[in-house]
Amino acid sequence: MIDQAKKIYISDVTLRDGMHAIRHRYTLNHVSQIARALDEAGVDSIEVAHGDGLKGSSFNYGFGAYSDLEWISAAAEAVKQAKIATLLLPGIGTVHDLREAYDAGARVVRVATHCTEADVSRQHIEYARGLGMDTVGFLMMSHMQTPVGLAQQAKLMENYGAQCIYVVDSGGAMNMWDIAERFKALKDVLDPATQTGMHAHHNLSLGVANSLVALENGCDRVDASLTGMGAGAGNAPLEVFIAAAERMGLNHGCDVKKLINAAEDIVRPLQERPVRVDRETLALGYAGVYSSFLRHAETAAKKYNLSAFDILVELGKRRMIGGQEDMIVDVALDMAKGRVLPT
């Protein structure tokens, strides 16, 4: 049973994870308009960055239309209540980049690592705490760790100073029982003062359900995005999640109608590729593949006259993770040369 009196921290990711859906091409006007709408609707924080975090703009991940600092500044100037958050992946972004993001207006940082590599986050978490930022540990591809193993990684992040630890279903590959087991494991080892969060992807159409199950198991913060704008089939759609929470009598603090209008009037028209469950995005959840591989796999499939579905399934078989985007072309070349049989 979910505590109806407990305030759910609503973390919007339309302006960070949503970058993947449009190849990191938001204009500054888009950012201002979306941030203002989210702020007026009552969300607690708005994450802003290249889809792959601070300094993600690159040949490997895709170049952004603007710099992270320009996007963050535009969002910070547009809001009155919501905190501006950002994402940092050690090895891509540095503490110097984090300082610049802080100066531009970011007050929350999520330090993201693969679910087996929490130890690389220490420097960044400690630095963020030194700045006085709300500091979050973000364990990506959480389906690739056992619940106990994930909890051990979460404990490392807590020891470094993280105030909240996220279960991150980057592949949209987990079901409700997977989520429940991981939150129970985290709660068994973390200090009661350390919060937990849920970042869902909708590749198996379970983004909202998994977020609700997370809340049922003590989760404090929930990520979501307008129309689900995000990598793959997107994240838990914010307006849908809030509508469901409203019907359950949960304390979310948001205006449902304003979110629905922002989703339909502002965000959906920006989608060059519909953010939905289809053959390719379902492959991500089915094969347990990093959701941001989608657009890269589709590009490779077109170039080499292959099926994006088959490329994604093969990537899942090889257990590729975020940061190995260059391997998508290698897999496509192997398939084109007949070294790998189609699924």
Swiss-Prot record:
EC number(s) per entry: 4.1.3.39
Function as written in the Swiss-Prot or TrEMBL entry: Catalyzes the retro-aldol cleavage of 4-hydroxy-2-oxopentanoate to pyruvate and acetaldehyde. Is involved in the meta-cleavage pathway for the degradation of 2-aminophenol.
Pyruvate carboxyltransferase domain segment(s): 8-260
UniProt-annotated binding residues for Mn(2+): 17, 199, 201
Catalytic activity line of the entry: (S)-4-hydroxy-2-oxopentanoate = acetaldehyde + pyruvate
Active site, UniProt feature: 20
Keyword Lyase applies: yes
Protein family per UniProt: Belongs to the 4-hydroxy-2-oxovalerate aldolase family.
Single Gene Ontology BP annotation: catabolic process
Keyword Cell membrane included in the entry's annotation: no
Name under which the protein is recorded: 4-hydroxy-2-oxovalerate aldolase
PANTHER family: 2-ISOPROPYLMALATE SYNTHASE 1, CHLOROPLASTIC-RELATED (PTHR10277:SF9), HOMOCITRATE SYNTHASE-RELATED (PTHR10277)
A GO molecular-function annotation: 4-hydroxy-2-oxovalerate aldolase activity
Alphabetical UniProt keywords: Aromatic hydrocarbons catabolism, Lyase, Manganese, Metal-binding
Record-linked CDD domains: DRE_TIM_HOA
InterPro entries: 2-IPM_HCS-like (IPR050073), 4OH_2_O-val_aldolase (IPR017629), Aldolase_TIM (IPR013785), DmpG_comm (IPR012425), DRE_TIM_HOA (IPR035685), PYR_CT (IPR000891)
Organism field: Pseudomonas sp
The organism's place on the tree of life at top rank: Bacteria
Annotated positions for site Transition state stabilizer: 16
Positions annotated to bind substrate: 16-17, 170, 199, 290
